[in-house]
Every structure is written in structure tokens, then in C-alpha cells.
Amino acid sequence: MSYVPAPTETAQAATPGPTVTPRRSVLVTGASSGIGNATVLRLAQRGWRVFAAVRKEAEANAINAQGVTNIETVLLDLGDRRSIQSAACEIKTRLGTQGLDGLFNNAGIGLMAPVENLPPDELRHVFEINVFGQIDVIQAFLPLVRQARGRIINNGSVADHFTPPFAGALASSKTAFASITAALRLELRSQGIHVCLIEPGAVHTPAVKKTLGGLEKVISGWPSESKVLYANALRQVANIAFAKSDRGGSPPEAVAEVVERALTARNPAARYLAGNDSIKLAVLAWLLPEKLLDLAILRFFGLPTTFGKS
């Protein structure tokens, strides 16, 4: 593709000479592992100047130890607005007179539990990170993106299209973020800023293990009646989801490739389905009547399909 730099992206040498076009720059949140880290490495290897945002100093050190040029780490905590503002100021200083060509909002968290037993504080935390924290990042970095007429790429989920049992917290937060993305896309269109949504299916990442690894702790806090009603079903859904991710999920590098496409395409799509099963799942959600989709989901997870019978 042909890349047209923003007017502020050229720099004159100290003595008369040819114009130098700086590398394109991008901020990737949640860069310590999984999709975020794969995207950081892919873009850096293709010459981008990559700002890899992580929560902890140890995570920054681990990225630096990978020894890949073009990567600059920055500390950014989606749950802390001051941290986000500080990161924005730091990156603005590092960029100098240049803007930010790309923003990939990738960081997020998951939670599996029946709606009846969702701890309100934990549900709020999921939305704080997956929705409000993402909005904080967009608001903090949009002036830099606007300066470069860059792009905003948001990481959603194929669960935007359907909600598995016990995934209400994650799916609802991702659906909310998809709506925010759609509104932002329309609002920034006249400003020449593309906004895209990536919708991965099952991906083999540490985030899946982290979500599933704490299930027994979650179950242990339920009242006895809830354990009888939900515990075995939740374990079954979790085990199938883990197996799907572990054995049939796409590598994070496959999603990173789609992110790069969204950043570089001349006319990027509004949404990109990413991964082995994302297209199939989205098409099923689009085509099947909701009651049939419910039955298909229940059968996939081996749960009872007869109404009123467990």
C-alpha cells in the first residue's frame, strides 16, 4: 500500500538535503503477552516504531529482553486514569513534532460466572477495564492520532455476535465496546481517521488460562444452592472453552496479522473477523434464529437443551 505521511511527519536535515520520512508509530496496549505481544513484534519487525504499553516494570523488562529494535516500552494501567494520562504525555514527548499513526486498544480481562452469582464489584471491574479504561485511552491519545491522521484499532470479540453461558460479563463488555467503536468510527470519519474493530474467535493466549484458572476460587465463594445449580455446568463450559482455545484456537500471530492489515489497508473495513473459527461463529449468529442459536450453543457445550430439565 502507499503511505501518505501527515504534514507534521517530515523532518529536514540540518543542512539542505532530501526530506526524511520517519517511521510510522503505533501504541499497543496489553503488550506483555498474547495478541498484544504478537502485534508488537510483528509491527516492529516491519519497521514501525512501536510503543508497547504494559502495567508492570517487570513486563517492560521482559519485552526489552526480547532484543527487538523499534520497540519502546511505556507503563500504562487501564484501571488508573492518571497512569493513562502520564503515558500519553510521555509518548507525546518522545514523538516530538510527530503524531501517532496507530492506536491498538488490546488490553482487557475476562470473567466466567453465572449472572446470578456475578460479584457486582468484579463485574464493574470488567467494565472498568474493557470499556471505561479503553475510552480513557482513546480520549488521551486521540489528539496525537488526529495530528497524524492515524487509525484506531479496537480489539473486540466474536462474542459481540452471541453470548455463551457464563460469559455474560465478558460478552456484554465487548458488545458495549463494539458500540463505542461504531459511534467513534462515524464521529471521526470526517476528520480522516479510520476506526476498526477486530473480532477474534478462539485464540491460544495466556489470558484464557488466567480466566479459567480461577474458577474453583470463584465457585468456592458461592452459596451451597448455587454450587448445586451451576458448578458442574460452569466447569464443563470452561473445560470445553479451554480445550477449544488450547487445541483449536488460532495463534495470536494470526490476529496480529489482521491488526496490521487494518492499520495499513488503503480502505480498511469497519470490522475484521480474526482466527480459525470467527467467521463460522459470526455467520451462525447472523443466520440462525435466536432460539436455534441457543440450542446450538447449549449442544456445543454439552448442556441440557430441554426447557425446565437439568
Task: Give the residues covered by each predicted segment.
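Conserved glycine-rich cofactor-binding loop
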Residues: S32-S33
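Substrate-binding pocket helix/loop in short-chain dehydrogenase/reductase
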Residues: P114-V115, E122-R124
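Residue(s) in the substrate-gating loop at a strand-loop-helix junction
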Residues: S157
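Active-site loop immediately N-terminal to the catalytic Tyr-X3-Lys motif
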Residues: E116, F162-A169
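C-terminal beta-strand-loop-alpha-helix "lid" module of Rossmann-like NAD(P)-dependent dehydrogenases
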Residues: S190-S245
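The beta1-alpha1 cofactor-binding region of Rossmann-like NAD(H)/NADP(H)-dependent oxidoreductases
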Residues: L76-C89, P120
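Active-site helix of classical SDR
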Residues: I138, S173-A176
